[in-house]
A protein has these predicted regions:
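Ferredoxin-reductase
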Residues: 1-38
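Gly/Ser/Thr-enriched, mixed-charge loops and adjacent short helices
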Residues: 28-168, 172
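Short, high-confidence coil segments that cap the C-terminus of an alpha-helix
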Residues: 11-13, 172-175
């Protein structure tokens, strides 16, 4: 969601996310986003495919050194300031209307698993800023790993993918 949001925030023509997603490892790759921050439609993908098919791979492809593309502004990294705005935007959508004192008086205890994806830093950052400091992370699924060694189909909608998190819940008894 960070890149999708950043495409709109930065006014980009599009974005590409190299991803491990929440799909099995053979489906890892990239996701292309349009200027609206949404993944491109099948129509847009077909138009891109047609343009690629109509291009001579030896003479019709424009190329640029990566460092030169960065220096010219054609390639942009998502910088910390963009991430900070993203975290602020996520927090602004929060339904939490409790004061800091109320949060401190009734702390929330959570178990979280990023399923070997990239959610650890943004999720724990937003939770901490919302006053949630007691977060136990599933250790085997904490670090990003596109091979997903702990669950072959790391989609949180599939119960088996969440089994390690469920097991940890039974040990630490979160709220």
């Amino acid at each position: 969601p960070t890149l999708s949001w950043a495409v709109r925030d930065l006014g980009c023509s599009g974005g590409i996310c190299m991803t491990a997603s929440h799909n099995p490892a053979p489906y890892n790759g990239y996701k292309a986003y349009g200027p609206d921050g949404c993944q491109i439609t099948s129509q847009a993908a077909a138009a891109i495919s047609a343009a690629i098919a109509g291009t001579d791979a030896f003479t019709g492809v424009k190329s640029m050194d990566f460092d030169g593309a960065v220096a010219s502004g054609k390639v942009k990294w998502i910088e910390d300031a963009v991430l900070e705005r993203y975290y602020d935007a996520v927090l602004a959508q929060s339904v939490n209307n409790l004061s800091d004192e109320q949060i401190a008086a009734a702390p929330l205890k959570l178990v979280y698993t990023p399923l070997n994806g990239t959610g650890l830093v943004p999720v724990t950052t937003v939770l901490a800023r919302a006053g949630v400091s007691d977060v136990t992370v599933v250790p085997e699924q904490e670090q990003p790993d596109g091979n997903f060694p702990t669950c072959p189909y790391p989609n949180p909608e599939i119960r088996e993918a969440m089994q390690k998190g469920i097991d940890l819940c039974e040990q630490v008894h979160p709220d």
